[in-house]
From Swiss-Prot:
Family to which this protein belongs: Belongs to the class-III pyridoxal-phosphate-dependent aminotransferase family. HemL subfamily.
Matches recorded under Gene3D superfamilies: Aspartate Aminotransferase, domain 1, Type I PLP-dependent aspartate aminotransferase-like (Major domain)
UniProt keyword annotation of Lipid metabolism present: no
Name by which UniProt lists this protein: Glutamate-1-semialdehyde 2,1-aminomutase 1
Residues with PTM N6-(pyridoxal phosphate)lysine: 270
Molecular function GO labels: glutamate-1-semialdehyde 2,1-aminomutase activity; pyridoxal phosphate binding; transaminase activity
Entry keyword set: Cytoplasm, Isomerase, Porphyrin biosynthesis, Pyridoxal phosphate
The enzyme's E.C. designation: 5.4.3.8
Organism: Bacillus thuringiensis subsp. konkukian (strain 97-27)
Gene Ontology cellular component terms for the protein in this record: cytoplasm
Length: 434
């Protein structure tokens, strides 16, 4: 039982004097769970965190997804250390970036060509530019609630970060830019068709999270992604998959490979960096050849393909190639799902739980969650109380009702058993205070 956060509170007070909002990403604040000082972590190992007060946690945040192999995995840390000893940045081509690109192509057959960048935001931003260059069109389509990074064009009806010809979701995004974005509900073919009938001749591409991760884990309805491909291609536009969260999370490869649907372009990030900053994008050869120096679509980056990130990414994928690893994540995910649902029934707490393999989301509602409107119509106040009760139990979750719980390769059955017991105590406390 965690009872002391004195040092975290003091550190946050100091951080507020020097860092905007006291955090370097707004999702790290506790604003969405009732406020207070966010817990500051000092170190991580495997499936566990220790904060600055010395409290230990089972971690299901996994840095919002990238840490699929657990914290400080020895194979990855060794690769990073070796790369750093040889120099962290050259500004030249390296053998590491060629090896890593080949690994990504072998894992994801839709990638004829690849280019490395520094973040998922950059990857998505650049796929949009490439799609516009290839089609000669300007408008972009996306699904409501799906978050594709913080560049201007995609901060429109966004998901877990912020909340129908577009409306900006952030100050500083001009209405003129937002009007280049058409937003439609996820899992709704009819609305997509209507939008394409109206604007399809102006659309360069549609951005798709093939499995949604930013208003919780939401799978596409059977046949939905196939219909997206069909309708968008009929309109002469491209399909871009944002696999920043999903790639290598559910299988060795992308969600596109798991689901058997092929996009024209793909944006990658998170898991492929093994915990270091990274992004990548790729796709069909004829489309990717729009990118400089071969084509007119310019993209560059001083840090892109840096040796440390390349080495970390290679090492991470080498770990993920181990036999039975994804089956273990699915087994533990199923065990956790069953336990949470049993505790909810025992304590008469209304929840809906969405899970795919080693990732899940607990929504405080009885409604089915298959789009952003349904995810919004859940009890955020109840989630905030649950989040803080779990923190007291030594279980670290994301401080948002929209985020997923991520399992890592280092979680054990004992971790899951303890977590289920902690959920039971948290639900009991919530039931007592209804």
């Amino acid at each position: 039982m965690v009872v002391e956060f004195t040092k975290s509170e003091a550190l946050h007070k100091e951080a507020l004097e020097h860092i905007v909002g006291g955090v370097n990403s707004p999702s790290r604040s506790f604003k969405a769970v009732g406020g207070g000082a966010p817990v500051a972590m000092e170190r991580g190992k495997g499936a566990y965190f220790w904060d600055v007060d010395g409290n230990k946690y089972i971690d299901y945040l996994a840095a919002y997804g990238p840490i699929i192999t657990g914290h400080a995995h020895p194979h990855i840390t060794k690769a990073i250390t070796t790369a750093a000893e040889n120099g962290v940045l050259y500004g030249t081509p390296t053998a590491l970036e060629v090896k890593f690109a080949k690994m990504l192509k072998e894992a994801m057959p839709a990638l004829d060509k690849v280019r490395f960048v520094n973040s998922g935001t950059e990857a998505v931003m650049t796929t949009i530019r490439v799609a516009r260059a290839y089609t000669g069109r300007t408008k972009i389509m996306k699904f409501a609630g799906c978050y594709h990074g913080h560049s201007d064009l995609v901060l429109v009806a966004a998901g877990s970060g912020p909340s129908t010809l577009g409306t900006p979701d952030s100050a500083g995004v001009p209405q003129s830019i937002a009007q280049e974005v058409i937003t439609v509900p996820f899992n709704n073919v009819e609305t997509l068709k209507e939008a394409l009938d109206k604007w399809g001749h102006e659309v360069a591409a549609i951005l798709v999270e093939p499995i949604v991760g930013n208003f919780g884990i939401v799978e596409p309805k059977p046949g939905f992604l196939e219909k997206v491909n069909e309708l968008v291609h009929e309109a002469g536009a491209l399909v871009i998959y944002d696999e920043v969260i999903t790639a290598f999370r559910f299988m060795y490869g992308g969600a596109q490979d798991l689901l058997g649907v092929t996009p024209d372009l793909t944006a990658l990030g998170k898991v492929i960096g093994g915990g270091l900053p990274i992004g990548a994008y790729g796709g069909k050869k004829e489309i990717m050849e729009q990118v400089a120096p071969l084509g007119p679509a310019y993209q560059a980056g001083t840090m892109a393909g840096n040796p440390a990130s390349m080495a970390s990414g290679i090492a991470c994928l080498e770990v993920l190639q181990q036999e039975g690893l994804y089956e273990k994540l699915d087994e533990l995910g199923a065990m956790l799902e069953k336990g949470i649902l049993e505790q909810a029934a025992k304590h008469n707490i209304d929840i809906t739980l969405n899970r795919l393999k080693g990732a899940l989301t607990v929504y405080f509602t009885t409604n089915t969650i298959e789009n952003y409107d349904a995810a919004q119509d859940t009890d955020g106040e109840m989630f905030g109380k649950f989040f803080k009760l779990m923190l007291q139990e030594g279980v670290n979750l994301a401080p948002s009702k929209y985020e997923a719980w991520f399992l890592t390769t280092e979680h054990t059955k004992e971790d899951i058993e303890y977590t289920i017991e902690a959920v039971g105590r948290a639900f009991a406390a919530l039931a007592d205070n209804k």
